[in-house]
Amino acid sequence: AFFSDANIIKSKVKGALADSPFGQFFSPGLAEGTNVEIVIRPQHVRIDFDRDGKGPLPTVSMGRPARGCVVRARFLGNESLVEFRMDFDNSIFKVTVPNVFLPKVGQPLWLTVPRDRCFVFPAY
């Protein structure tokens, strides 16, 4: 990736906001209808457990949760890399977690992303 390892969600600006499965992201200075990419680094994603098909409640700072199922988990020495197949578009979403975290393949988990750790850029 251009910046570093990152998850990219494509969106479009409407009313100064870019909508995504994780909720809306402020897009100041971008014109209405601009195609954008929401950039989310793997280390900034938070993981929460599934509660009978439900995730954590949405919050202003974390947006709404999006569900994915584990497709691979590896311990990399000082962190774990967990890859999810996301329910919203079947894409692969990468998350890094400090220490050992190795959920079973197929396990559904919920992901949230803190708004202050994500970036919205015009798509080229």
Where are these regions (language model features)?
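Conserved beta-strand-loop-alpha-helix hinge in the C-terminal portion
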Residues: A1-S4
